[in-house]
Amino acid sequence: MILDQYYAQPKCSPSRAALMTGLYPYKMSLQRGAIGDFRPMGLPTVIKTLPEMLRSAGYSTHLVGKWHLGYCHPDYTPIRRGFDTFYGMMSQQSDHYTREQAVNKYMGSGYDHWRDGNVTYEGAGLYSTNLWEEETVRLVNSRNSSTPWFIELSLTAAHSPFQVPERFSDIYRAGRSRPTGSKEEVSAWENGILRRGMVTAIDESVGRIMEALRASGQHDNTLVVFSSDNGSGMKEGNKPLRGKKGEIFEGGVRVPAFVTGSPLVKNTKRTSPGFKR
């Protein structure tokens, strides 16, 4: 079931907060933007989260990938917010191969990769999308009971920095000439190539996860929800929509989304968002 008029928030953390709580971000004082590095704030601990509700209902709960809802105190971190396991990063972005943040070059610190409540160096050098995919497939394949489960896979691509294995970016370089204009024009062209490759890498990894669900016999009893937290930060990546990430034009908030996998979405039909005359 494709949701072709699905709206998120203009920035990462507000969208994640809404997904985790079912509340508008302004009700949690998180409407203004992303929770940046070293910020003494996070998703309010007095508000019950989706994984907490599911765990109360008997689900096992797992987070793979990006958290980005605060880590200034252990009470704000995933393991304290309803997840039984966490494998990923706490903050907004890091190098897709080294897990180091941009602050590393200024402060001599900034490594961001966690297994539950401890720093881990697993998967050193592995591209982030493949790293999160492997962990998700492992969780799917390791399920050996009738206990229902919830996995939030929060991929760090296609967020900057723009990095991807060459076999993906080469798809979009073929037959295209590198521009010879200004430094900004060349950079925008290169970033566009890389970002397209990053999305293709995501597509491949999501496909492998879906195959793992089918192979394990869990696909038809699993509700899969795909969403994005905001529009592209590059305006040309949102065409024909106006605007970009951080703006309330449709280019910043209207994002891809679909639901699949469960009997709930079989035999669906398309409805038009238009008005009848």
Feature annotation, model-predicted:
Residues 1-277:
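Formylglycine-dependent sulfatase
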